[in-house]
Amino acid sequence: MRMLLIHSDYLEYEVKDKALKNPEPISDEQKTGRLDEVLAVFISVEKVDETNPDEVVEKAVKEIEDVASQIKAERIFVYPFAHLSSELAKPDVALEVLRKIEEKLREKGYEVKRAPFGYYKAFKLSCKGHPLAELSRTIVPEKAVSKEERNIALEKEEKELKSYWYILTPEGELIDVDKFDFTGHENLKKFVNYEIAKNRVADREPPHVRLMLEQELVDYEPGSDAGNLRYYPKGRLIKSLLEQYVTEKVIEYGAMEVETPIMYDFEHPALEKYLNRFPARQYVVKSGDKKFFLRFAACFGQFLIKKDATISYRNLPLRMYELTRYSFRREKSGELSGLRRLRAFTMPDMHTVARDLKQAMDEFKKQYKLSMEVLKGVGLTPEDYEVAIRFTRDFWEQNRDFIVELAKIIGKPVLIEMWDQRFFYFILKFEFNFVDNLDKAAALSTVQIDVENAERFGIKYYDEEGKERTPLILHCSPSGAIERVMYAILEKQAKLQEKGIKPMYPLWLSPIQVRVIPVSDEVMDYALYVAGKLEGAKIRVDVDDTGDRLNKKIRKAEKEWIPYIIVVGRNEKEQNTVTVRRRSDGRQVEMQLEDLIREIKGQTEGFPYKPRPLPLLLSRRPKFRG
């Protein structure tokens, strides 16, 4: 690092134009700046500084402090100045170093201003001209630290962050997790154990994997990377319906749907801190000499749209949504598990721009309720998942009633994780977590209040007086990854199987809702007539025209979890009725076809519909496994 330190009567600047393709995002207020009676510090961050930027920051701050104390300066102007060196660091590293110098000087009590990075700027200053008014410094890191080592240190810092664990009851009682009586809350106890132990590796295959294979829904793809799956027609139908359902719910809530790229530039300055957190978990793509990473959320694209948008206070809260197909994370191979943890996944992702904390908390509560509603629609009630709420001690002390209200809404005790200080970008977060048959938990719905990224990405809104303001941002996935929803549905049914209860999909998600079984070929025409009527009513139906015996046909339908089995013979044909086996209650009844249609439509009203994913006749279908 090269530094030129000038004690000046004043320093002022004005941004003229971009010097980099992706400069630091700035507001209109940041396009000009001035400080009087100031120590101006012109800085070139060099290539060698990349080996240990943290050491360079510490040394630079110490040198600046030494000079400031000698000249008795209380104001410091950090000014990016590329012209002190011909061996410059990468823009993302340079910006990180400059930001950290600014932050650390401010923490030490100085009034600090930093000129924007990545722009051509005009500037004026007036050097005081005394013996210490013009000084230069060169800083060289003594110990080279690789980027990988820096990120290992970051992960270690996160792991060492002390968590305080409590159970919060709907009555508002906050109880140390070791003192809570878990009687009647055994699933919560399993979730607590999982969270505190943080053991993500399963020692055996979870039951949903067997079910997804048996049902010919989803399978492993040996021709791809681990954690990338193939979907057979029935699995694709379920996944597609879930995608449509969640998207419709979010748009109904008031979000605007967008679409953004799946890859982003490694050197984009606003993305640097995201990327450095978990570098080993990114897929990297090269295009020419440039490196790109595959997104692991929709945040990047939506934030960049918001940065370029003109947003008024009248537009707030502003909700934006994308269903990412796909998001990518190179999860550790030992943590990959069926549909529970993948490397390529489909994430419904909504981001809300909120004016202030009051509006953000109001949205947080609404999105909490929205998430409950979305999960209810896929067959998951509060009895099926456990709630975790995470925040700092300060937030709890200032917003206790708000947190207690969340426990009241869910109507049962929730897990609290509390920190003494904020390490992450959010100040409040909840997740609805499904605990599976191996006592492993997976987060489904989640909402976070983000206090950092609006500033990092340069997202602004204009208030009533036309002044630029920095908002807060809520991250919301009302269902969690679509694959995880499928995992939770299958794991819940596996639990029911263990209790001797017949497993079922929610009716609107059943790939085949009705199977028609003719007792003989002579009533095949009537079987096809019945199927045609049902199909005309937008009910997914098929016909077992194979040569199997009747009992075997019924067993096949049972194994496929088909909700309604219609058996038609000569009697039904003559009377124009159907004999229905209802899976939900095990009853067999004779009824008019119109009554069955009415019953099914009543249960699927309000949910999306897609046609049957396979041929009408079973004899025409391929077998995808075995």
Curated annotation (Swiss-Prot):
Keyword terms, alphabetized: Aminoacyl-tRNA synthetase, ATP-binding, Cytoplasm, Ligase, Metal-binding, Nucleotide-binding, Protein biosynthesis, RNA-binding, tRNA-binding, Zinc
Predominant location: cytoplasm
Localization in the cell: Cytoplasm
InterPro entries with a match to the protein in the record: aa-tRNA-synt_IIb, aa-tRNA-synth_II, aa-tRNA-synth_II/BPL/LPL, Anticodon-bd, Anticodon-bd_dom_sf, DTD-like_sf, Thr-tRNA-ligase_IIa, Threonyl-tRNA_syn_edit_dom_arc
Subunit structure: Homodimer.
CDD domains cross-referenced by the UniProt entry: ThrRS_anticodon (cd00860)
Family from the record: Belongs to the class-II aminoacyl-tRNA synthetase family.
Domain of life of the source: Archaea
Matches recorded under Pfam families: HGTP_anticodon, tRNA-synt_2b, tRNA-Thr_ED
Cofactor(s) recorded in Swiss-Prot or TrEMBL: Zn(2+)
Organism: Thermococcus kodakarensis (strain ATCC BAA-918 / JCM 12380 / KOD1)
Encoding gene (name): thrS
Native organism taxonomy: Archaea, Methanobacteriati, Methanobacteriota, Thermococci, Thermococcales
GO molecular function, one term: ATP binding
Domain comment in the entry: The N-terminal domain is an archaea-specific tRNA-editing domain that hydrolyzes incorrectly charged L-seryl-tRNA(Thr). Catalysis of tRNA editing is performed by the charged tRNA itself.
This protein's GO CC annotations: cytoplasm
Protein role: Catalyzes the attachment of threonine to tRNA(Thr) in a two-step reaction: L-threonine is first activated by ATP to form Thr-AMP and then transferred to the acceptor end of tRNA(Thr). Also edits incorrectly charged L-seryl-tRNA(Thr).
Full protein name: Threonine--tRNA ligase
HAMAP family to which the protein is assigned, alphabetical: Thr_tRNA_synth (MF_00184)
PANTHER family for this protein: THREONINE--TRNA LIGASE, CHLOROPLASTIC_MITOCHONDRIAL 2, THREONINE-TRNA LIGASE
Region (Editing domain): 1-145
CC cofactor note: Binds 1 zinc ion per subunit.
